[in-house]
């Protein structure tokens, strides 16, 4: 009814329709005044924003085929590089609808990108629900539990030529890297070509650290193993606590860090919690 609250989804739908609707312009004046619908839209001709579709093929630290030469805040859609209005790294590999703000001939930035419905099939499997690696139709596959309350497993088939992104960087496909047995993390599988097989495998493999001390140079010492993690300007890193991005200096003793490090140790993704570490004392 007219008194019901409108959902965010419907607001977005109505806004998009309004922005993309063709404009009406006056083509006759005086007694012959009339209006005609043109090919112009509010989005393109007034706001200087164009809409397009494509696939995000590279981000600042990696691409779907290897390394990346992009700067921070840039993405590549198909074969064209854009600046971005916010971090879109989580859309690597996805087919997206995107909006480009045109400020000038050489000044274009993507202000919004969204996965295209029905053109991306993804599945995230946590290490807790990971069962084992297996095969299906001659291809590597992952057997996993649908949830924690069932003993029944499902199987996800991985394409024979699938791309592997391990802890944020491209790697040659390696079964050992996608085997989450006795590990902490998750796997996201993406079928971007709708053939029923997953063609991109994103692995996040975390190592947990309990902060003992943090130096002014970015050296973080683990409280129980004395292992050292160094986050300084020689590496790329991002530290998040909840939805907030924080700095090394914000870390405190007993913070629990889940650290995903690329194999070359040049890229680190760190998630921070204040969870209490539980365990059993096995010796004096």
Sequence positions of predicted segments:
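Terminal recognition/anchoring or ligand-binding modules at protein termini
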Residues: 1-129
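Extracellular/lumenal glycan-associated surfaces
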Residues: 8, 13-17, 186-190, 223, ...
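Structural detector for short beta-strands of small beta-barrel domains
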Residues: 35-71, 116-151, 202-225, 272-284
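Surface-exposed or flexible loop/turn and strand-edge residues in extracellular/cell-surface modules
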Residues: 72, 153, 159-161, 184, ...
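Structured surface patches comprising rigid loops and adjacent beta-strands/short helices at the edges
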Residues: 80, 85-87, 116-119, 130, ...
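Short nucleic-acid-contacting surface segments enriched for D/E, G, S/T with interspersed K/R
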Residues: 83-99, 168-188, 242-258
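Extended non-catalytic domains of envelope/secretory-pathway proteins
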Residues: 180-182, 229-262, 273-277, 282-284
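Acidic, glycine-anchored loop motifs typical of Ca2+
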Residues: 194-198, 265-266
């Amino acid at each position: 009814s007219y008194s019901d609250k409108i959902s965010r989804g419907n607001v977005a739908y109505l806004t998009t329709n309004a922005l993309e609707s063709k404009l009406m312009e006056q083509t006759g004046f005086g007694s012959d005044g009339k209006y005609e619908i043109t090919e112009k839209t509010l989005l393109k001709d007034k706001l200087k924003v164009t809409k397009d579709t494509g696939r995000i093929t590279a981000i600042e630290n990696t691409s779907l085929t290897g390394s990346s030469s992009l700067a921070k805040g840039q993405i590549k859609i198909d074969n064209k590089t854009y600046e971005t209005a916010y971090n879109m790294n989580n859309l690597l590999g996805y087919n997206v609808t995107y909006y480009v703000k045109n400020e000038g001939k050489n000044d274009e930035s993507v202000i919004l990108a969204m996965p295209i419905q029905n053109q991306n099939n993804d599945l995230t499997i946590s290490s807790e629900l990971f069962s084992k690696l297996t095969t299906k139709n001659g291809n590597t596959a992952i057997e996993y539990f649908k949830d924690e309350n069932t003993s029944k497993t499902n199987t996800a088939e991985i394409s024979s030529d699938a791309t592997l992104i391990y802890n944020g960087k491209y790697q040659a496909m390696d079964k050992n890297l996608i085997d989450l047995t006795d590990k902490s993390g998750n796997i996201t599988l993406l079928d971007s070509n709708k053939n029923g097989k997953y063609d991109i495998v994103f692995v996040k493999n975390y190592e947990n650290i309990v902060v003992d001390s943090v130096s002014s140079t970015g050296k973080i010492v683990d409280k129980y193993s004395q292992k050292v993690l160094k986050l300084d300007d020689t590496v790329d890193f991002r530290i998040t606590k909840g939805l907030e991005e924080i700095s090394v200096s914000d870390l405190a003793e007993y913070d629990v860090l889940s650290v995903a490090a690329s194999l070359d140790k040049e890229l680190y993704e760190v998630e921070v919690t204040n969870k209490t570490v539980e365990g059993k004392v096995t010796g004096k």
